[in-house]
């Protein structure tokens, strides 16, 4: 068993402070990043045939997706809200299949969906705060469709990917 990280207490405190001081918008981005990181680790576990790590990481991502589902106001929402809820539900079902079938392709599908939704939320935040314009975001989206998505890196020992 590897020795405990002597900084783990401080890392945990840093993460807690980040969560406690984050805006609701930043918390949403953090949820997407967390789910994507869980799924990247699940893919590694699938490749290594590590049942425990696969299940643990897929379950972590599913918990985050359920939390994202809870943020949707279906009673007062529009078709976009309902569509997003169905998409999250499909992702959750795909992760169940991925876990049972040890299928990394299903995990990749969910990573791609989460990455696309995260990008949309990030751009909406940037537009709302005046960091970018809708036109700039649309140009970036068109350029991004020509390239592969860049996923947040996996960080060991509970690290934080603060932007």
What residue spans do the PLM features occupy?
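N-terminal leader/targeting segments and the first structural element of proteins
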Residues: 2-79
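Short terminal interaction segments
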Residues: 2-18, 111-163
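Generic structural concept
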Residues: 29-36, 55-62, 85-92, 108-118
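A broad detector of the eukaryotic-type serine/threonine protein kinase catalytic domain
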Residues: 40, 73, 93-96, 100
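Hydrophobic recognition helices of helix-based DNA-binding modules
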Residues: 65-68, 95, 121
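Charged low-complexity stretches with an acidic bias
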Residues: 67-72, 86, 141-142
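Secondary-structure capping and boundary motifs in well-ordered enzyme cores
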Residues: 80-84
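Amphipathic, charged alpha-helical scaffolds that flank and support histidine-based chemistry
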Residues: 95-111
């Amino acid at each position: 068993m590897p020795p405990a990280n002597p900084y783990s207490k401080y890392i945990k405190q840093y993460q807690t402070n980040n969560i406690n001081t984050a805006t609701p918008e930043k918390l949403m981005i953090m949820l997407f990043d967390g789910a994507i990181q869980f799924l990247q680790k699940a893919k590694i576990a699938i490749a290594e045939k590590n049942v425990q790590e696969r299940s643990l990481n897929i379950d972590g991502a599913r918990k985050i997706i359920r939390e994202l589902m809870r943020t949707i106001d279906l009673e007062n929402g529009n078709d976009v809200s309902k569509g997003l809820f169905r998409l999250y539900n499909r992702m959750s079902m795909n992760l169940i299949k991925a876990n049972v079938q040890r299928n990394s392709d299903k995990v990749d599908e969910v990573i791609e969906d989460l990455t696309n939704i995260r990008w949309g939320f990030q751009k909406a935040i940037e537009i709302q705060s005046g960091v970018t314009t809708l036109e700039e975001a649309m140009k970036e989206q068109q350029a991004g469709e020509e390239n592969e998505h860049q996923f947040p890196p996996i960080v060991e020992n509970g690290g934080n990917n603060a932007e």
